[in-house]
């Protein structure tokens, strides 16, 4: 009988903790790698917009931990876009990436899929990443659960 109570209590706690977890948004920014780096450091990918076959670094330069706020947009094709505001660490990482990798491609992954590709043609020191389109309503909903909107008042 005690065993049945323990199992029942465990199932109730497991179910409540599983339902309490909301899906957070993941963002990864990967710089273009070198095919000579090998499979440990770079992986081949076909870019969605230009269709180029490139190698990207397996380690992301910027992640969702570097994002401090966002602003969603409705794109003309019916999807969504977003402006991501980076914190100080993300701003420095983006600035460094844009200086060191000028002339290369950067891929932005949102929730595990490629949202956009960016070509680095100048220094980016404002700490903002713009995703013009290609995001779904679920992506925006997960962003809403993860970060505040740019310019929104902080909750007390």
What do these predicted ranges mean?
Residues 20-156:
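Structural signature of multi-pass, alpha-helical inner-membrane proteins
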């Amino acid at each position: 009988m005690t065993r049945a109570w323990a199992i029942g209590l465990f199932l109730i706690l497991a179910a409540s903790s599983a339902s309490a977890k909301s899906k957070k948004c993941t963002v990864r920014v990967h710089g273009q790698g070198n095919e000579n780096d090998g499979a440990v450091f770079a992986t081949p990918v076909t870019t969605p917009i230009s269709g180029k076959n490139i190698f990207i670094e397996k380690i992301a330069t910027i992640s969702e931990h570097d994002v401090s706020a966002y602003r969603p947009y409705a794109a003309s094709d019916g999807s969504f876009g977003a402006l991501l505001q980076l914190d100080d660490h993300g701003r420095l990482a983006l600035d460094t990436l844009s200086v060191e990798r000028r002339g290369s491609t950067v891929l932005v992954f949102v929730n595990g899929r490629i949202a956009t590709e960016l070509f680095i043609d100048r220094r980016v020191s404002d700490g903002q990443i713009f995703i013009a389109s290609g995001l779904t309503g679920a992506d925006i909903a997960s962003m809403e659960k993860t970060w505040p909107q740019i310019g929104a008042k902080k909750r007390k």
